From Swiss-Prot:
GO terms for cellular component: chloroplast; large ribosomal subunit. SUPFAM superfamilies: Zn-binding ribosomal proteins. It is found in: Plastid, Chloroplast. Belongs to the bacterial ribosomal protein bL32 family. GO terms for molecular function: structural constituent of ribosome. PANTHER family: 50S RIBOSOMAL PROTEIN L32, CHLOROPLASTIC, LARGE RIBOSOMAL SUBUNIT PROTEIN BL32C. It comes from Gossypium hirsutum (Upland cotton). This is Large ribosomal subunit protein bL32c. InterPro entries: Ribosomal_bL32, Ribosomal_bL32_plant/cyanobact, Ribosomal_zn-bd. GO terms for biological process: translation. Keywords: Chloroplast, Plastid, Ribonucleoprotein, Ribosomal protein.
Length: 54
């Protein structure tokens, strides 16, 4: 089994954690932006069928 030889420093650990958090933040921002454009009808990447309730 692979075992690390030395302990990871706190600063390196914090940097890696922040990179990981930032990826999630950007993914959420992109998803929110897409949802907003779909709800307003300004989406250029999705074709949403309009349903008329009459």
């Amino acid at each position: 089994m692979a075992v690390p030889k030395k302990r990871t420093s706190t600063s390196k650990k914090r940097i890696r954690k922040n990179v990981w958090k930032k990826k999630g933040y950007w993914a959420a921002l992109k998803a929110f932006s897409l949802a907003k454009s779909l709800s307003t009808g300004n989406s250029k990447s999705f074709f949403v069928r309009q349903i008329n309730l009459e």
